[in-house]
Amino acid sequence: MKAIETAFQGLCRYPDGGGFKLKAALADRYNVEAGQITLGNGSNDLLEIVARVFADSTSEIVFSQYAFAVYPIVTQSIGAKAVEVPAVNWGHDLQAMEKAITDNTKLVFIANPNNPTSTDVVKKKLLF
């Protein structure tokens, strides 16, 4: 019973909503300022934050066919134009994606490995 009592102490407290300790630890580990780190409730939340910061209703967002389902949802949620590039063998066609970029393109989403197809792109090809 003592172990249970000890384990339950503090369970009624809410976690730090700003992630102060986590941001400090990440900043220390990756040698960046804590203010450069944004935390979110999973990738969906972070992708929406990124879209809202960098794009708007006049923007285009490029992503591959068969890419992560959240990309078109996030694009639609901010009223941006979705530019879906046809996939090749269920994977990203990086050359076609690059050609799809216009002056209105604010984001290019590339999942690697891709979800849901599990195809991947080697790092060297991503650094264009």
Please place each PLM-identified region on the residue numbering.
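Active-site phosphate-binding strand-loop segment of PLP-dependent enzymes
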Residues: 88-128
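A short helix-loop-beta submotif of the ANL/AMP-binding
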Residues: 78-82
